[in-house]
Amino acid sequence: MSIGGRIAGELERTIYVIAGLPIALRRGSNAPTVAARDIRRVYASRYWRPDRPRDGIELVVGLILVPIAVPLAALWFTIKNGPIIRQREGKGLLAQFGEQLRLYFAAGIVGPWYYILSLHRDGPQRAPTFLQRCETKRGIYALLRGKTGSPLGEKRKFAERCAAAGVRCVACEAVIDRKAMDTAELPDCDLFVKPLTGSGGRGAERWDRVGRRHWSNGKLTLGETALMDRFRDKGRPMIVQKRVRPHPALEPLTSGATPTVRALTMVDEQGRPELIAAVFRMSFGANRTVDNIHAGGLACWVSLADGRLGRASNLGSDARLGWTSDHPSTGARIEGRQLPFWPEVKELAIRAHTLFADRLLIGWDIAITEDGPILIEGNRGPDMDLMQRFMDIGFCDHRLAELIAWHLRARGYVPNDAQASKMSVVRVDAQ
């Protein structure tokens, strides 16, 4: 990993410590459901018991920075987004700033998440219902991790396992690495190239075929040898795939990148995968490579019942776009549109999870083509911001919390006094 990557990782973990402090102190006292209370009690126990010396150092550093980082983050994002929210909703800058501070102490809401989760609207009532990134990335995910480690994050092995089981998945055409030469030729078609391991669309490139064994990324046109050399010079293994073209009905919903469904599945109480939630991701503006919302893309809610789309937005940490019923680049209608092959998309997500049954929670990226849905990849630590951005009530008051609490209980992490409690949750499509 590069020095910049290490610094970013350390900063991210420090933010998790800062955001997690109020949650750990409250130990679920303001949780909206018994399931959420159990999750937060488990998280609190883990928060104060670092696994490694490095984790202990990060805990101390994060606690020291709380009095500085929290007001500075609130100030920065108020300056960035506050005038826009004031114009749209009439809430003043001081009111937004003060509410961010109050919601930090009440629910661990730091800077950008106040705007990501639209907590400038009914924040005090809604904030405790959201499952925070710090709770999953620095807590619960580690406790839910399986021991066998199926190759979900290894893109080539992932594709091979899916192909062997007859699950439709984008194939790996070649892996390019200067340490281990792949003798396969590049397929003479449009290409999508990304790091062998990685997430968030970082490092991905799109190369369109412009002639026999020549490709262009919109700025450069290269032949096969030059293109292979470019990939080898990346300093890390790169996977080459044929670029997937979207279903014709979905082409108006993208500025060029292939749009995908992010489908969240989790193993239920009987050991069967269950579809929990889904969003649809789209590119807009100058982005023609990836649809990831963290890379500046759009997303919208998908009704599990019939595959209809809700209103769209970006991640929300930048409030300029806001919410829209139409695609901001193409003008095509988003809200109310029904995804093609929706029953098949749901079936594919469930079936794929059976191939990686040691993973309790998986986020699937699924493209919908003219021939039906096809898996792009699976994510072992799925991002909750992407899903909860489009929810009025968060995952703590949802089926997902019930399943997480059940698995924590089954693994012995939940205190005995909570084991007989019944949990009341809201189904996703009730939102």
Where in the sequence are the language-model features?
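Active-site nucleotide/adenylate-binding loops and adjacent lid/helix of ATP-dependent enzymes
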Residues: 138-261, 266-270, 431
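Glycine-rich phosphate/pyrophosphate-binding beta-alpha loops
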Residues: 201, 260, 281-287, 379-391
